[in-house]
Each structure stands twice: as structure tokens, then as C-alpha cells.
Regions:
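N-terminal export signals
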Residues: 5-26
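Short hydrophobic segments within beta-strands
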Residues: 46-48, 74, 119-120, 151
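Helix-loop-strand module that forms the ligand-binding subsite of alpha/beta enzymes
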Residues: 86-174
Length: 205
């Protein structure tokens, strides 16, 4: 075996070891999550997605199906531009300024009916999408005494500030489960990971 082959083979070994370590850490983190017992029909998934076939919509739909949850969509009163660059021009200053964007009432959603609320958002510039921030801010009193959790789709930045800022808005009146970030580019082929988000956190009776 020459030097070049040795280096190549060692690189492969290190890569596999790193992958295994990552999976081990992921499994260990999941095993440390305290599951919440919830009755069937007492979970709601509330989400915002920029586009009709968006990653966050897919994630929310998959999670709701696994949890046997009711599914509700947050919609901006004035929708963001469907052109990506123009949407960025609108949303970026809102995100950096932690501004609230007006949203429509969610038809049929009565939070009093639910014990667990899972909130879905895209990660925009490291934080919640403004319509999600608006909804959480408007409903933080109604979420008191409930179990809540945020999940997000992202473009590569991971969780960033989303989980932290969600917890800051909610405060200590609700039980907050560990957040979860899903890579947007692969979320539509990550059904098992989306389902594990539910089974790691909830024990549906």
C-alpha cells in the first residue's frame, strides 16, 4: 500500500467514525428527552410555510400525522412575495428587528382543546419567521400550563437562535420540550427523522 492509498483509506475510516459518533450523540440526546404522556386527539401542530409545497409544510404534515394531531396553518395577513429574492427583501429587516407581521385568525383553532402544541417554522436569518413570532406572542397566555415544542427547517445553519427565542417569548408558564432542526433540502426524504421527533417526545395514549 503506497502513501496515497494509506491516506485515502484513513480518511474513509475517520469519516465513518465521525458519522458513527454523530449518530451516537443523536441517539443519546433523544434518550435523554423526557417523554410527555398525552391523550389521543389532544395535540395540535401549528406552522407557517412560505410556499404551498414548502419544507416546513411537509414537516408539519408528517409530524401531525405521526402524532395524530390536528393541523393548523399560520398565514400572514399580507402574504410574502412569491419571488424568493423579493421575499428576502421583505422578511430580512423584520427578522433582524424581531418585528411582528400581522397574521390572519386561524379558523377552527381553540387552544383550550389541546394539551400539547407543536410549532413549526422555517429558520429565517437565525430566528423564527415573523408570522410565527406573532402567533406565539399573541397566544403565549393561552399556552400557559401546556406542553409546547418548536421544530424548524433550515438551510444549513442548524438550530441557531430559534429554540432560545421561542423559549424567551413563551416564558416559564408552559413546559417546553427540546426543539428540533431539520435540514430543508433533505426534509422531504426524512420521514423517519420527522416521526422520531414525535416518538422521542410524546407517548400518545
Amino acid at each position: 500500500m503506497n502513501r496515497k492509498e494509506f491516506i485515502r483509506n484513513m480518511g474513509a475510516v475517520v469519516g465513518v467514525a465521525a458519522l458513527g459518533l454523530g449518530c451516537t450523540k443523536e441517539a443519546a440526546a433523544a434518550s435523554n428527552i423526557e417523554k410527555v404522556s398525552v391523550s389521543a386527539g389532544k395535540t395540535a401542530v401549528v406552522y407557517f410555510s412560505w410556499s404551498p409545497d414548502g419544507n416546513t409544510r411537509f414537516a408539519a404534515t408528517t409530524i401531525a400525522k405521526k402524532a395524530g394531531a390536528a393541523l393548523f396553518e399560520i398565514k400572514a395577513e399580507t402574504p410574502y412575495n412569491s419571488d424568493f429574492n423579493k421575499c428576502c427583501d421583505e422578511a430580512k429587516p423584520e427578522c433582524y428587528g424581531k418585528k411582528l407581521r400581522a397574521i390572519k385568525p386561524i379558523e377552527g383553532l381553540d387552544l383550550a382543546k389541546y394539551d400539547v402544541v407543536l410549532v413549526g417554522t422555517p429558520d429565517w436569518w437565525g430566528t423564527m419567521a415573523p408570522p410565527v413570532r406573532t402567533w406565539v406572542t399573541q397566544n403565549k397566555d393561552a399556552l400557559k400550563g401546556k406542553t409546547v415544542c418548536i421544530f424548524q427547517t433550515h438551510g444549513g445553519g442548524g438550530m441557531e437562535r430559534v429554540g432560545k427565542e421561542f423559549a424567551e417569548v413563551i416564558g416559564d408558564a408552559a413546559k417546553i420540550l427540546p426543539p428540533k432542526a431539520f435540514l430543508g433540502s433533505s426534509v422531504k426524504s426524512a420521514t423517519k427523522a420527522l416521526e422520531a421527533f414525535v416518538t422521542d417526545r410524546l407517548a400518545v395514549k
